[in-house]
A protein has these predicted regions:
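Long, intrinsically disordered, low-complexity Ser/Thr/Pro-rich regulatory/activation regions
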Residues: 4, 57-111
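Non-transmembrane alpha-helical segments in soluble domains
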Residues: 31-34, 125, 136
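Conserved phosphate-binding loops in nucleotide/dinucleotide-binding enzymes
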Residues: 18-22, 107-112, 121-123
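Conserved pre-motif C helix in the palm subdomain of viral-like polymerases
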Residues: 116, 121-131
């Protein structure tokens, strides 16, 4: 994904959250979202712990299967079978490299951190804070 990159920022509940546009796709900073829940030095741990969860892997795998024709399903199945074990660890970088995932993006350097497509970022937000749940459709009457 080394192409045209542009960053902007939005404020969510008084917390600045970076949005990186890569090849005309917006990726929201999971790192910034995690910093809102914990101290800056532990944001990466929050993301890694979220990635370890079986429900997270199932969501990510389903998203990638739907939107990424180059997703490596066999590698995904391996991660899914390991999820839940005490010895299972997974970083965003490892997920991307092993499965050819496009929904998560890792950036080193000045705007470094872990970024995700808005669908994935909203899922992450709801996992770390119920007040960050996003309703993407208008509320329907009962």
């Amino acid at each position: 994904m080394e192409a045209t990159k542009k960053t902007t920022s939005i404020t969510v509940q008084d917390v600045p959250v970076t949005i990186m546009n890569v090849d005309q796709r917006d990726y929201i900073s999971l790192t910034d979202m995690a910093r809102a829940r914990t101290d800056a030095g532990r944001a990466a741990d929050v993301i890694k712990n979220w990635l370890r969860a079986r429900s997270t892997l199932e969501f990510l795998g389903t998203w990638e299967i739907m939107y990424n024709p180059n997703f490596k399903v066999v590698e995904f199945d391996h991660f899914k079978s390991e999820a839940g074990l005490h010895t299972f660890t997974l970083s965003a970088k490892e997920w991307i490299e092993k499965t050819n995932a496009v929904g998560i993006y890792v950036q080193a350097g000045r705007y470094g951190g872990t970024y995700a497509h808005k669908d994935i970022a909203f899922e992450f937000g709801s996992a770390i804070s119920l007040s960050l749940i996003h309703i993407s459709e208008p509320t329907r009457p009962y």
